[in-house]
């Protein structure tokens, strides 16, 4: 188990640490706000906050994970170790950006709750996203960051064992409209029948008849 010291355990902190450490890397993570308990812990441990306690493995926080609600935040994306990163922190931190806040920002789709231009279906457009604007939309940056964190943890705590991860592939189909013919209403159905006949789309006309008439 990896023990994390933080002055405040918030739902955001608990969620993102468990996502990275447990769901992605496969190790258990615990939290404490007690300095004595942290210092007495003999196993792998790290602190997360504004300042380190001493010489422990330290990850400096941006501050977003201790806030409540949605607020506009300034983000500067930069290159780091052949990938992208944001929420930069000082060189006191073991990683030069707040990996946990950056991951939470993407996992929670934080930017979609901020004012934005919607597409024709009233949705947040991918073209408005941070990933698209900085050319990492198709890159699994959270996983990349997590496995770079794994290397750091292995170097710092050789006794910390990581299980082999088993992966499965699931196919997803994004359908803007659930049904081609059903639930269109009488008027739109009549328009569809008329359009099929006018354009001689007989197969589609017959299929529409079977679907609409049951």
What are these regions (language model features)?
Residues 1-214:
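Terminal accessory/targeting
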């Amino acid at each position: 188990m990896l023990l994390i010291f933080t002055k405040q355990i918030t739902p955001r902190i608990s969620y993102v640490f468990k996502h990275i450490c447990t769901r992605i890397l496969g190790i258990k993570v615990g939290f404490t706000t007690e300095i004595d308990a942290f210092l007495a812990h003999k196993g792998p441990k790290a602190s997360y906050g504004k300042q380190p306690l001493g010489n422990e493995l330290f990850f400096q926080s941006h501050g977003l994970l201790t806030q409540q609600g949605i607020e506009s935040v300034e983000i500067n994306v930069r290159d780091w170790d052949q990938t992208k990163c944001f929420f930069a922190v000082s060189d006191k931190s073991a990683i030069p950006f707040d990996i946990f806040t950056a991951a939470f920002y993407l996992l929670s789709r934080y930017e979609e709750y901020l004012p934005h231009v919607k597409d024709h279906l009233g949705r947040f457009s991918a073209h408005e996203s941070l990933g698209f604007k900085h050319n990492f939309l198709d890159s699994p940056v959270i996983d990349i960051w997590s496995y770079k964190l794994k290397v750091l943890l292995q170097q710092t705590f050789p006794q910390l064992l990581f299980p082999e991860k088993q992966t499965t592939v699931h196919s997803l189909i994004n359908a803007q409209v659930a049904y081609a013919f059903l639930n269109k209403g009488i008027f739109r159905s009549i328009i569809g029948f008329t359009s099929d006949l006018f354009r001689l789309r007989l197969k589609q006309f017959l299929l529409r008849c079977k679907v609409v008439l049951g």
